């Protein structure tokens, strides 16, 4: 009985950290945004990653604060073609593009000020 209760707590505890998020990255949106001179923020995540969940919370707020910036994301383990296209090897990667160039890349960053600074980089 005790083992069953512990197992239930562990399973529900892990699932409570799962990210409910969808892949929004497409080549078409990425290329069009670049052509339009927009800043593009790309986030690589995994649904069971705690660091990714922290980043999602920050990036969701950033979408409201940086209205002219395009935010795209993809699930690293499911969307391997996107990861290869962008040369992204790890969950928790945030990449910023401006004027068809990568201007910033971080892995594992969860500090809001640092992420915002990365987005503001020109």
Regions found by a protein language model. Name each.
Residues 10, 17-37, 118:
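N-terminal leader/targeting and pre-domain segments
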Residues 35-47:
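Short active-site neighborhood of thiol/selenol oxidoreductases, capturing the structured segment around
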Residues 86-95:
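Structural micro-motif
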Residues 27, 31, 56-60, 80-83, ...:
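Extracytoplasmic/secreted envelope proteins and their assembly/folding machinery
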Residues 44, 68-80:
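Thiol-based oxidoreductase modules, predominantly thioredoxin-like and allied folds used
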Residues 98-122:
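Non-catalytic, surface beta->alpha helical segment in thiol-disulfide oxidoreductase systems
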Residues 4-13:
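Sec-dependent N-terminal signal peptides
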Residues 51-65:
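Typically the conserved alpha-helix immediately C-terminal to a functionally engaged Cys/Sec
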């Amino acid at each position: 009985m005790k083992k069953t209760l512990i197992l239930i707590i562990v399973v529900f505890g892990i699932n409570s950290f799962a990210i409910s998020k969808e892949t929004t990255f497409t080549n078409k949106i990425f290329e069009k945004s670049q052509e339009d001179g927009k800043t593009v923020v790309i986030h690589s995540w995994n649904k069971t990653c705690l660091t990714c969940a922290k980043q999602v919370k920050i990036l969701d707020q950033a979408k409201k604060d940086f209205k002219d910036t395009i935010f795209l994301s993809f699930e690293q383990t499911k969307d391997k073609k996107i990861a290869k296209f962008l040369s992204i090897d790890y969950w928790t990667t945030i990449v910023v593009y401006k004027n068809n160039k990568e201007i910033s890349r971080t892995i594992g960053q969860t500090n809001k000020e640092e992420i915002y600074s990365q987005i503001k980089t020109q």
